Regions:
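PLP-dependent amino-acid enzyme catalytic core
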Residues: 1-304
Length: 304
């Protein structure tokens, strides 16, 4: 057995995710234009999403600074993937994890968080993430735990600057021309764009946003909703709006035509990448497949 194939811990398996070229969706048009569309499979991370990276980073670095220690209670407001990733990271590092989120999250996410040992507090869906964040802040003020605050924590985009961005650059051998990401906490797009723009300012950075009246899990419409403090708009060249119907249709197409079992926000980013591909030539367009489709089975996006 080759020892270099053995990871010392599960946290060492986070990152270095595959970058896969789409083969069928838009194939004829892409071949004609000389474009390549690539999906970075962040669902391959141990807890199943791109959020594994910042979750572990926020806990590790807070611990290194002496802000927290194993056995402490951590608090976070989250709509899903960050909660699952934090639950895993807290289990690895020995923390009690309390997650606060709107009550309309999918049952798969809630069950997964509990499987990792996290405690859940559900808030009224009418209050959205703002209500959940306010409650987390109140609990911290009352001394009930330490809030990691993914929306304002610089360790969130920093880990994408240090890992996700360099991986994309290396995997494309510097040929990447466009980067597309859904925008939730904005940690991914902020960190990756910062790295890629340093490498090549000509690389276009595109954020996927829900169109008016659409609700896509994992994507929030900024600045109509709470604008994260970590968001750096200076490196984002364009926002493209995707409807819920188009995102869900692309979700099904990715599974059936490419064999990529992606979540709805990932499919929204793919849809945006396809729109960009219709406007350019000889481009290498990468998008983040931020999680897997099994977290959305109860939503009805996939036919029974």
């Amino acid at each position: 057995m080759n020892s270099h194939l053995i990871y010392p811990t599960i946290e060492d398996a986070i990152g270095k995710t595959p970058l896969v070229a789409l083969q069928r969706i838009g194939a004829a048009d892409n071949a004609k234009r000389g474009n390549v569309i690539l999906g970075k499979l962040e669902g391959n991370n141990p807890a199943g999403s791109v959020k594994d990276r910042p979750a572990l980073s926020m806990i590790q670095r807070a611990q290194e600074r002496g802000d927290i220690k194993p056995g402490d209670t951590l608090i976070e407001a989250t709509s899903g993937n960050t909660g699952i990733a934090l639950a895993m990271a807290a289990a690895i590092k020995g923390y009690r994890m309390v997650l606060i989120m709107p009550e309309d999250l999918s049952i798969e996410r809630a069950q997964t968080m509990k499987a990792f040992g996290a405690e859940l507090i559900l808030t009224p869906k009418s209050g959205g993430m703002e209500y959940a964040r306010d409650l987390a802040e109140r609990m911290q003020a009352e001394g009930k735990g330490r809030m990691l605050d993914q929306f304002a924590n610089e360790d969130n985009p920093r880990i994408h600057y240090e890992t996700t961005g360099p991986e994309l650059w290396e995997q494309t051998q510097g040929r990447i021309t466009h980067f597309v990401s859904a925008m939730g906490t904005t940690g991914t797009i902020t960190g990756v764009s910062r790295f890629l723009k340093e490498k090549n300012p000509a690389i276009r950075i595109i954020g996927a946003q829900p169109s008016e009246g659409s609700r896509i899990p994992g994507i929030r419409k900024w600045p109509q909703e709470y604008l994260p403090k970590i968001y750096d708009a200076s490196n984002v060249d364009e926002l493209v709006y995707v409807s819920q119907d188009d995102a869900e249709d692309m979700c099904r197409r990715l599974a059936r035509e490419e064999g990529i079992f992606a979540g709805i926000s990932a499919a929204g980013a793919c849809w945006v990448a396809m729109q960009i591909a219709q406007q350019v030539e000889n481009a290498t367009i990468a998008f983040i497949v931020c999680d897997r489709g099994d977290r959305y089975l109860s939503t009805g996006v996939f036919p029974a």
